[in-house]
Amino acid sequence: MNEDAPMDLVDDRFADQSIQDEPVDDGESFYNEDVYVDCEEDEDDDVVPTSENFRLENRYKPSLHTPRELPTIREENREDVRSNTSSRVNTRPPSVLSDKSNDISNMFGFQDGGRAIDQYTDQFYSEGNRAERLFPEAGFLQNSPVRDKQNSWEPSVCHYEKQPTPEVKNNSPGLVFANMSSKKDVTRKQENVRPGKMMPEKVNDENEPKSRRFSPERNTFTTSPMNSTKYLEEKTSTPKRPGGTNRLGTRGLPSFECSTIYDISPQRTSGTPKTYESRHPTNAYTPNSATTSDTVLSNRTIGDNTVQNVLKGVDINLLTALENARKKRDRPQVKPDFRLNSLPRGKLSSTQRPKSDDHSSMTSIVSSSTQNNTGYRKIQEQRNSATSTDLTNSNTSNFTNNTSRVSTAKNDFSRSSRQRNGFSDSSVSTIIPNMNSMTTRDRDGRDSVSSVRTISRASSTMTVGGGNGHMTSGAPKPLRFHVSRLGFGYVPIGETLTMQLEVENTTDRPCKVNARLDSKITCFKVLDNATTMIDPKKAIKVRVAFTPTSLGRYSLYLKAEVAEQNFTQKIPVWGWGGVSKIAPISARNLQPTSNSSEFAMFVSDMKRIAFKLGNSGDRSGFALLTVYDSAMRQVPNSYVRFNPSNGIVIGKNYEKLIEIRIDPSYHDHYGELTNNRTSSAMSTVSTASSMASLRRRVIAGSDFFVQVAWGVEGIRERLRMLEMKHKRRQMIDGLDFTSHPFTDEKCVVYPPPDAYPTISDEDHDLFAASYSNFYINIFSSPDGLNAFRAATVSADKFDNDATVLETSAFRHQTFVNDVTMVPRHTKLM
């Protein structure tokens, strides 16, 4: 229908129809007969003002609640009502609008209607009205007993205005549908008008077509057009109030804007209702807009063209957008995770491990086989270096302290230089500066007759060095550990082995470190203070002692905690109780000497050398035999044969017969060297071979001697597994313990169980620190044997400390200071 059609034509069309909309006689009704004006009978008369005796405390009480008993148009009759819309069109002269006598706000003592608007708005958004403001037709406001469709002052069906959508600005809140603006917003809009542009005047004329006329009451509960287009039709309601006012007597209820969708009213200066905030997450798509915490949905602004196309039925994109918005509203909001390193890292690969200058090249993992072989050769060169410069620059020198221990125990002859059995607490150790020390190629060499090196692995303090502990997270750690674990290896039952763990403070402030063990096992003990302070960029050493009480495996964790920084580092600590003890069985032709690592044997026929080796320890052990001549040259394999082999495995409490046959042509090939021996004093010692050669000059003696390197078979099996892991030969002090089979060894070795320590480069160093040596001197004449015995007794009687030996006791180096004095009586030839 054309809205500009003459009203008489409308009256002719619907003359026979009318609506009985007289007010109900109710004491609580808002309808007032005295002030009601029938505009159809007398259109020119002014509205009769309300009596002066009409007060706020009397019958009319603006309680901000809608009346209950006023009749409204029911849902089932709205089709009939639509046909009678034109019969209720009322026209009022402009004089009535200009007459301020009907301004109900002045009657109630209000200066303006703003306070009533604010009261109504606050009541509408109060905590008690937890209504669904997104779609009011399905919300709590329409279904409550006070505001249901049967007892509501509001229209039974809400209208959707056909007014043009205001311009959407860039700074407008993101996509709101119920943006309520008060007089403050209107004032703000007027201030934003350009100076040269006139503000259009808004005239409240009831003769204006309803499609363009502003209706505050209907706009308050405007319904979304997403369900159907029937809401665009005009609806009738209960009788109008005088003067076009609302139930509070004011004209300026909050206006309705279509610029945005789903936004809470900006009039709200107080907090948003909790239920409203929980249903509507914060806008995440328009963070730079004017949307504050009141933004309820994360949608983009819908343009004017899209809205017009939807209203005209051309496009349904808006319907789809509204449906998606409704689905997103029910979707739970993902909470941000502010934890550091929320994704745990796995173990670093071999190529990603952190590097360090003081990290031992022996413990570094090389990716390619070519680099492995090159690195191995470099290690051997550094180990065999003969100068003090090489010693200072070598990686292995970092494992020794600036001071070394020199044992002065005179009566402790039960231990060999590498033997841990027979350790006594009566040993006296003295700290001396390590000044002009030289490195040696051989780990043990052969000890002096006049001095017994009593520094064994079980009786010494070990300084553990090596690579950094693996970093499991990207966050910097306040402490830096030079090893990832403490491996004590095999320790004799009842003996004590002490190791030092270096801990460095990497921060710029002091750290209070608490070191403790996570188990109550008495075998392990932290010797230092449990709590200590570490200065910035400084390091301390934590001593841990291991004393096994029975045969078995022990493992626990050493925890280093920095409570102020909530940091805890665990260092695995493990060790075995019980060792093997291999030694030659004394016979008539084989006798021990005052040095526990030296034995003398008389053999009339050098073609066959036979002796027995026995294992009196608690575990199976291995023995590797090597034959040297009097000039400390190793006899080639083509001139010597071993029966059963040069490598054997001996079980505990078991003996094995060893036969060595030397080809007589060996002397013809290399010449007789016994007449070339000298008694010159030692001025510089650089290698184990030269040191042994010096002792051969000092101690007149043997034609050959046999070096027996022995240890626990379990630690050699770990070395074999390390060799299979890296696929390269593991040489220990120039000796090969793994490339050839040993007699009675296991044919196949398997990786250790999960509860056991994993195979790592530390096993190489652990093996080098744990195996021991002893020597059997072979004499072809009784005179040589007697001279050897006399030299041994004289050296022990006159010069017990003739040679001062220093060792790190855990790593690869043996140092000899240039203080050796050669007794004059040792020269026999």
Curated annotation (Swiss-Prot):
Compositionally biased tracts (Low complexity): 361-370, 384-408
Highest taxon listed in the record's lineage: Eukaryota
Assigned keywords, A-Z: Cell cycle, Coiled coil, Cytoplasm, Cytoskeleton, Developmental protein
GO molecular function: molecular adaptor activity; protein kinase binding
Subcellular locations according to the entry: Cytoplasm, Cytoskeleton, Microtubule organizing center, Centrosome, Centriole
Pfam families membership: Cep192_D4
Region (Disordered): 1-29, 41-104, 183-294, 326-471
Chief localization: cytoplasm
Coiled-coil residue windows: 314-332
Biased composition (Polar residues): 83-93, 217-230, 266-294, 409-439, 448-463
Keyword Cell cycle: yes
Gene Ontology biological process terms, A to Z: centriole replication; centrosome-templated microtubule nucleation; embryo development ending in birth or egg hatching; protein localization to centrosome; vulval development
Compositionally skewed regions (Basic and acidic residues) per UniProt: 54-82, 183-216
Family matches, as InterPro entries: Cep192_Spd-2-like_dom (IPR054090), Ig-like_fold (IPR013783), Spd-2/CEP192 (IPR039103)
Cellular component annotations (GO), alphabetically ordered: centriole; cytoplasm; pericentriolar material
Functional description taken from the UniProt entry: Required both for centrosome duplication and maturation. Required for pericentriolar material (PCM) recruitment.
Protein name: Spindle-defective protein 2
The organism of origin for this protein: Caenorhabditis briggsae
Origin organism lineage: Eukaryota, Metazoa, Ecdysozoa, Nematoda, Chromadorea
